[in-house]
Structure formats: C-alpha cells, structure tokens
Regions:
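Short secondary-structure transition hinges
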Residues: 95, 102, 106-141, 152-153, ...
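Hydrophobic alpha-helical connector segments
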Residues: 66, 80-109, 162-166, 186-189
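Helix-turn-helix
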Residues: 20, 28-62, 66
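Short hydrophobic clusters on alpha-helical segments that form packing/core surfaces
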Residues: 17, 21-29, 100, 170
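N-terminal intrinsically disordered/low-complexity leader segments
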Residues: 1-16
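Generic hydrophobic, amphipathic alpha-helix propensity
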Residues: 13-25, 42, 67-75, 79, ...
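Amphipathic alpha-helical packing segments from all-alpha helical-bundle domains
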Residues: 73-77, 123-150, 160-164, 171, ...
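Amphipathic C-terminal alpha-helical segment
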Residues: 103-106, 110, 142, 146, ...
Length: 198
C-alpha cells in the first residue's frame, strides 16, 4: 500500500527540521565547544522551537552522542572502506591513515567532536568515542597480526598495542595540526605513514 503524499511531505519536513538541528549542533559544538553551547543556542541557529529539539533528542548530551555516532561513525566507515582497497598490509595501513587524516582536515568540525569535545564528556560519550576508535585500532591490529609472520618491521609488535598507538598518534597529530596550521593533510599523512607503515 502506498504512503499518502501528505504523509510523505510531513515526513520530509520533519527530516529537514532534524537536519537543521543536527547541522546547527555540529557547527556550535565544533566552533564553541560542548560546554559553552546550550540547547537555546542550537535551536536559535537552527531556527526551530525548543520543543522541536526535544522531539528528536532527550538532552544536549543525547544530541551530541547521536551526532558523534552518525558523523564519527561515517568518518571511521570511510577510513575502513578506503583501507580495504589496499593490496597488502602496507598499502591498507597507509590508505587508512591517509583517509583518516584527510577526512579530519576536510571535516574539521567532525574531527573536533571525535578528537577534542568527546574526551571525558560523560561515561556514555566516552564509551562511544572508544567504540569508534576501537574500530580503527582493531583494523590496524588485524593488519599487524597478519604481517608479523613475513614483515620484519611488524614481527615484534603487539598488534593491539600497535593499533591503539596508531589511533592515538594519528588523532593527536591531527588535533594539534588542525589548531596549529603549518602542515597540510597530505604531508601529515605521509609523515605518519613513514612511522607506522614504512
């Protein structure tokens, strides 16, 4: 049975309203920080009522978690998808690191949420951040695990530690150079690849 056109129009309006709220929240959380941003700031920027905000989110933190899950999840998905196209472990590691760095520079607002604003915010947000980072770290660890038997560089590396080290170093370097200009994404990615995927 077909959905009535009036219902489709209503659903489209609701989705546009949610999108305006999410876009406003992302810009404010990234630009001003989570702590300084209020629900009033978000609804003012999105040009919606407070009740519209609460139609979608229980709280400012719930909005932040949803945004981090959607946007951070999409970024990590892109990283893993790009890495999977590599022909060997070196290429997969390089592609993953490069995609993460370039994506963070292209979407610095999302990078700020994932790397800066989510740290220590709450137990739930921290758990989500760790879950997103773990997807990247686990993929790196898996590459190292397979490379240990035939690549001298990786033979003495603990895969889990190496995976976390890559995520930590790459995230920290991106966070630093997003706020201290002077290095472009490609140069930073190349330098990190020399360290972790020589």
């Amino acid at each position: 049975m077909a959905v009535p056109s009036a219902q489709l129009r209503r659903d489209a309006r609701v989705e546009r309203r949610r999108l305006r709220i999410v876009e406003a929240a992302l810009a404010l959380f990234a630009g001003h920080g989570y702590t300084v941003t209020s629900v009033d700031d978000i609804v003012t920027r999105a040009r919606v009522s407070k009740s519209a905000f609460y139609e979608f989110f229980e709280s400012k933190e719930h909005c932040f978690r949803e945004l981090l899950a959607e946007e951070g999840g999409a970024l990590i998905h892109d990283v893993l998808t790009s890495a999977a196209t590599g022909h060997d472990h070196h290429e997969r590691l390089r592609l993953g690191i490069t995609r993460f760095v370039v994506s963070c520079f292209e979407r610095s607002d999302v990078a700020r949420l994932l790397i800066v604003e989510s740290v220590g915010l709450s137990d739930d947000v921290e758990a989500l951040r760790h879950e997103l980072q773990a997807r990247f770290a686990d993929a790196v660890a898996e590459e190292v695990r397979h490379a240990m038997t035939h690549d001298a560089f990786y033979e003495d590396k603990d895969p889990a530690v190496f995976g976390r080290a890559v995520v930590g170093a790459v995230s920290d370097a991106v966070g630093y150079f997003l706020t201290h200009p002077g290095v472009d994404a490609d140069s930073l990615a190349a330098s990190l690849c020399v360290i972790f995927a020589p």
